[in-house]
């Protein structure tokens, strides 16, 4: 599971000068749905997110931590910095790092650079961002190699029912490579729905649709696209 819920973004407005932090705990049903293909998929994930707006733009990071009954199985992070191109401009220069470790090896690291367009409605109940970036994957472990890519990311957040409900999410498209070196289109979409009991506590669900970040454990399966829903709680600090 990979999240960049910058879509919860107050970034679009510079609405607050303070840091925005949340912690999410997800129970993942993917292994129940694909018992053969995702036999090793972890059921519990902890996500930490923080957004720090400032007068130049913002910092953002998240860390996804997969947990089992015995180990911290993996940790994956994305960290980015945006620099506003002008005061009150919706356009920003964007630089980013992706990478992480698991119990046996590592995720292939990548660096990204490009531009972002950030927007919001007058009352900030609707926010969105579009990012178009050059992406470079590095040789990170055995059988990987460096290669050039590009990524398009779209984020959104919609608050309604007097801000009791939030529908937010991300869709990302990028060029990946198959083991034989042939290029392919990688797709990741992660819509989330939250019911906000208070300003701090929410219960909701995330639905992950992806042909990437999946380790198919059934060599005879032809399944390439997966739907992995979760049940989750979130605390906003």
What is each model feature region?
Residues 3-13:
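Sec-dependent N-terminal signal peptides
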Residues 19-68:
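Short glycine/proline- and aromatic-enriched beta-strand/turn motifs that initiate or cap beta-hairpins
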Residues 21, 56-60, 86-93, 121-128, ...:
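Repeated loop/turn-to-beta-strand initiation elements of outer-membrane beta-barrel proteins
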Residues 22-27, 36-42, 70-155, 218-228:
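Outer-membrane pore/translocation modules
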Residues 25-29, 61-65, 95-97, 130-136, ...:
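Transmembrane beta-barrel strands of outer-membrane/channel proteins
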Residues 52-54, 83-85, 117-121, 156-160, ...:
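Residue-level signature of outer-membrane beta-barrel architecture
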Residues 135-202, 208-216, 235-237:
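Outer-membrane beta-barrel transmembrane domain signature
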Residues 225-237:
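Outer-membrane beta-barrel "beta-signal"
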């Amino acid at each position: 599971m990979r999240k960049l819920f910058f879509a919860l973004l107050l970034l679009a407005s510079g609405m607050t000068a303070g840091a925005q932090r949340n912690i999410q705990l997800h129970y993942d049903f993917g292994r129940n749905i694909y018992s053969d293909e995702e036999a090793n998929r972890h059921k519990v994930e902890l996500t930490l997110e923080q957004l720090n707006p400032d007068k130049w733009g913002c910092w953002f990071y998240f860390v996804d931590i997969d947990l089992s009954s015995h180990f911290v199985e993996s940790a994956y992070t994305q960290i980015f910095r945006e620099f506003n191109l002008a005061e009150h401009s919706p356009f920003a220069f964007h630089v980013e790092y992706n990478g992480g470790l698991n119990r046996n090896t590592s995720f292939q690291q990548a660096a990204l650079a490009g531009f972002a367009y950030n927007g919001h409605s007058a009352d900030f109940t609707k926010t969105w961002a579009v990012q178009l970036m050059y992406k470079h994957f590095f040789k990170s472990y055995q059988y990987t190699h460096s290669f050039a890519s590009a990524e398009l990311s779209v984020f959104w957040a919609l608050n309604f029912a007097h801000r009791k409900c939030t529908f937010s999410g991300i869709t990302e498209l990028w060029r990946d490579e198959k083991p034989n070196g042939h290029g392919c289109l990688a797709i990741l979409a992660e819509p989330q729905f939250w019911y906000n009991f208070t300003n701090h506590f929410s219960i909701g669900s995330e639905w992950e649709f992806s042909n990437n970040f999946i380790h198919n454990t059934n060599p005879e399966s032809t399944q390439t696209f997966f739907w992995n829903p979760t049940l989750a709680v979130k605390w906003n600090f």
